[in-house]
Curated annotation (Swiss-Prot):
Forms a cyclic heterotetrameric complex composed of two molecules of XerC and two molecules of XerD. This is Tyrosine recombinase XerC. It is found in: Cytoplasm. The lineage of its organism: Bacteria, Pseudomonadati, Pseudomonadota, Gammaproteobacteria, Pseudomonadales. Site-specific tyrosine recombinase, which acts by catalyzing the cutting and rejoining of the recombining DNA molecules. The XerC-XerD complex is essential to convert dimers of the bacterial chromosome into monomers to permit their segregation at cell division. It also contributes to the segregational stability of plasmids. It comes from the Bacteria. It comes from Pseudomonas aeruginosa (strain LESB58).
């Protein structure tokens, strides 16, 4: 079994030319399946059937493997069996039609509107770093950009006169987004300082040396701003989540929020309706005179 696995990995490396990172992922996942198969006394990939594989996956799930990790493992297993079938080394694919167990979907973390304003309304010093960081924070929250979209943003895609920005999102799809007044003002204050840094290319957000900021650098600046202004760790995607949640709460227009976020499937956007309900329930609990009543005083059953 190990020889077949090694042959498949070599096929991925030499013929499919997958990256070293992807190859390592395949190796780790398939070694897990191999270890479980050998522990069960199996000596051939043909001996692994769907029922056994389902049992293996369930065992890994019980050990704490996430649904995403298990889905990746099953994908790797399907790839192995497709290769073995083409090579005439096995007669079936036990992973065909098998899905990873679903875990409860975690709701995205957001800032409430007051906390978002607290983050953005602090005093800003008139220097290179402060103006740049304020501009990128404002743009994250104003337009709901992904981290990769902000990193890749070039000047030619920014139209401050019209208050618009174009970004290239997932699947290489381009979308046009509005830029709010506060974000426009922050960008207008930043761009003259950017020009003085001899930028190497058209990147909107650069370091002092003129190079485009990396994702890691932006994550660090956002986190530092969160600690400084809010006393909490903050991630760029939390600003995107806050943008979506606050917009949906104000407008109720799920389809518009989907378009602005660049979601291909509206089901992805619907997660924010759960956040909106959480907020409404919280307001109800705080404000409604009957919200925290434990039961009727007289124990009656009147409707």
């Amino acid at each position: 079994m190990r020889a077949d696995l090694d042959a498949f990995l070599e096929h991925l490396r030499s013929e499919r030319q997958v990256s070293a990172h992807t190859l390592d992922g395949y190796r780790r996942d398939l070694l897990k399946i191999l270890a479980l198969a050998e522990k069960a006394g199996l000596s051939d990939w043909n001996a692994l059937d769907t029922r056994s594989l389902r049992t293996f996956v369930a065992r890994l799930h019980q050990q704490g493997q996430s649904s995403r990790s298990l889905a990746r493992l099953l994908s790797a297993t399907r790839g192995l069996y497709q290769y073995l079938l083409r090579e005439g080394r096995c007669r079936h694919d036990p992973a065909n039609g098998l899905s990873a167990p679903k875990s409860p979907r975690k709701l995205p973390r957001t800032l409430d509107a007051d906390r978002a304003l607290q983050l953005l309304d602090g005093a800003v010093e008139d220097d290179f770093i402060a103006r740049r960081d304020q501009a990128l924070l404002e743009l994250f929250y104003s337009s709901g950009l992904r981290l990769s979209e902000l990193v890749g943003l070039d000047l030619e895609w920014l139209d401050l006169k019209e208050g618009l920005v174009r970004v290239r999102g997932k699947g290489n799809k381009v979308r046009e987004l509005p830029v709010g007044k506060a974000a426009r003002q922050a960008l207008e204050a930043w761009l003259p300082l950017r020009a003085q840094a001899a930028p190497e290319d058209g990147a909107v957000f650069i370091g002092r040396g003129g190079k485009r900021l990396t994702p890691r650098a932006i994550q660090l600046r956002v986190r530092q701003a969160g600690v400084r202004e809010l006393g909490q760790h903050l991630h760029p995607h939390m600003l995107r989540h806050s943008f979506a949640s606050h917009l949906l709460e104000s407008s109720g227009d799920l389809r518009a929020v989907q378009e602005l976020l660049g979601h291909a499937d509206i089901a992805t956007t619907q997660i924010y309706t759960h956040l909106d309900f959480q907020h409404l329930a919280s307001v109800y609990d705080r404000a409604h005179p009957r919200a925290k009543r434990k039961g009727n005083a007289d124990g009656g059953n009147d409707p």
